[in-house]
Amino acid sequence: MSEVALQSKCRSLRTELRTMKYASIWNEKSLLSGDPGMYLRLFHFFFIEYSPQIKTWIVENGYNLQTATDLSFVQQIFRLLQTQMGYRSKLTVENFFKPKFALQKLNLSYDVAKLIQTKAKSLNVTH
């Protein structure tokens, strides 16, 4: 995996996060190393903090993310992405928790940021 590809995807993700008004911790070094803790922060933002409509939609679909352990949280996210949003991750839950696979995690995070924004817009139209 090239350093250029990692840097490019990291910049793209940062742009999406700015669009989403993400104001929490941004540690590029952690992202580029594949640190699962940094990615968990991002996923908490995407699925719990970004939009009240998204949060409600998740609960209405039977997911309980707020009190879930990290493992359960990620398992539920992967299931939700596949069953509710038609997205199948190339990354496994097991690999998500390994401090590697940075490009796959960046790709997943970027894709999820786009999917969540699209879903939030569709929920705002219907509510």
Predicted regions and their residues:
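Eukaryotic interaction-scaffold segments
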Residues: 1-127
